[in-house]
Every structure is written in structure tokens, then in C-alpha cells.
Amino acid sequence: MIAAGLARPAFSAAAVKIDDSCALLVIDVQNCFLPGGSLAVKDGDQVVPVINRIAKGFANVVMTQDWHTPGHISFASSHGGKKPFETVDLKYGKQVLWPDHCVQGTDGASLSKDLAIPQAELIIRKGYHKDVDSYSAFTEADGKTTTGLAAWLKARKLKRLFVAGLATDFCVAWTAIDARKAGFDTWVIEDACRGIDTQGSLAKAWADMAKAGVKRIQSADIAA
């Protein structure tokens, strides 16, 4: 059964078994993206128990945090006369403008207190350069500045990545596509994600991921 608000898979995967070559990437499960947050993703809190459950089967877990400066270039408030969810052309490409969110050191930028993943090994903070956004856990939106995650994973001989979190159509999708570009087999755990879906972004994200070779899976199909 597909959770409400999720598009039907374009490229699904059969059940897979987790082993020592696998890592779970938990993307941006932060207070700003949860109910009551400044950029709340609809039903975003519903991913938390799913992620907690599947994380128990992974020895290798990486988490990410959006970590913006005040006045970040992705904020609508930084562009006079612009409103959230409008777009602007910046030097690195088209940028969706967002409400102020995940500002460094604020409670909104904190990871959900309900996450229970004590074995998480690494937290990647992204979007901390004021003049460029960063959806992906691997590469900033300029397509050049890397976070070092790919090298970290490869040094540990991790080859298969499972991506969960918020939001499906932005940080999850960009992370999954960049994971494929870096040579990793990549799955998105559909029921462990939720999307924003602005101007058709969710359907486009799934199509882009399928084109890149990213596979979809449900949490029930992951065998530890």
C-alpha cells in the first residue's frame, strides 16, 4: 500500500537484504520540516518511526542537517519583493525560494528529538555557505563543491545506499541522484520519505531519480 500523498513508483525494486556494504542516509529530519516548523512537510513526522525501525538493521548510518546562515540566499526574505516558493535565477541555476528555515544554532535546525539512532556515525551539515544552496548530501547546488561524503563512504567500502527523510522532491532526490553519480547502488525508501510537491516537483523528482537509476523500495521489503 502506498502512503497518502506519495506518487506510485515508476521504478520499483524487489526486497533486498542489508549487509556490511550498506549504509542508511537519513536526510534532514529537523524541526523546521516537521509539523509546526517554518517549512513543515505534510506528514513529515510520520517518517520518524519508520526510520527508527529500519535503522536498527543498519550498522552504518549517516544523518544530514540543513544548516543555513541568517540571510541565506535560498530564503525569500533575502530577495526583495519575492515570496516563498517563487523561483529566481542565480549564478548556479534556478533556485526555489523558501521561508527562513534551519538557521544555524536554532531549535528549528535541530534534529527531531524522536529520532532514535544511537549508532549514527556521521552528521553532514549542508547549506552553510551563504551564497549557494545545498540540497544534496554529496554536492552543493553549484555542482562543484563537495561535502566529502562520497570519499567517506568509499573509504569504508560501503557500496549500497538507502535514502530516507525529508523532503522527497528536494534533498532526498538530489542526494539519491548524486549517490548514483558517485557510483553507489541507491534505493529510496518510499514510505520513509515525504515530499513538499510545489509546481509538480514530486513527480519530476521521481522521474529524475528513475532516469538516474535510483530504485524505490518500501521499508517492509528491507531484510536485516
Question: Where do the model's predicted regions map?
Answer:
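Alpha-helical scaffold elements lining the catalytic groove of polysaccharide deacetylases
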Residues: 131-156, 160
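Short catalytic/ligand-binding loop motif for oxyanion handling, primarily in non-cytosolic enzymes
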Residues: 69-73, 132-133, 171-172
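Glycine-rich anion-binding loop/nest that anchors nucleotide
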Residues: 158-174, 188-194
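Hydrophobic/aromatic ligand-binding patch that stacks against planar heteroaromatic rings
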Residues: 178
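Active-site acidic carboxylates
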Residues: 5-6, 11-128, 155, 159, ...
